[in-house]
Amino acid sequence: MKHNISVTGIKLYAYHGCLDEEALIGGHYIVDVSLETDFTQAAKEDALEKTIDYVDVNAIVAQEMAIRSKLIEHVGQRIWDRIINEIDGLKHLSITIKKLRPPINGNVDEVSITIEGEVN
């Protein structure tokens, strides 16, 4: 049996980007995190301590998004590193960061990066 916990649509305002204006003005971001785990015992026992607490996942995302970076790729890697080091029981992890209305030439709704893979 495969179990997934998803924390999707985490809306944040942050100051990432290579342009000076982005450091001053900031922009809107949406982060999605999907975690594969085994929550059989948590489901049987109704026990939060036997599964991944999505409050912790949300906190990690918010803390890392608050640290300015030029690249959302860098932010995504920091989120990945913290989740795999701080949350037990992971089998697979996927993180997507969407930068809404990026300041690039053209009419673009969003740009995004995804980091996904197995966790040992």
Language-model region placement:
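N-terminal, polar/charged subdomain of small-to-medium soluble alpha/beta proteins
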Residues: 1-120
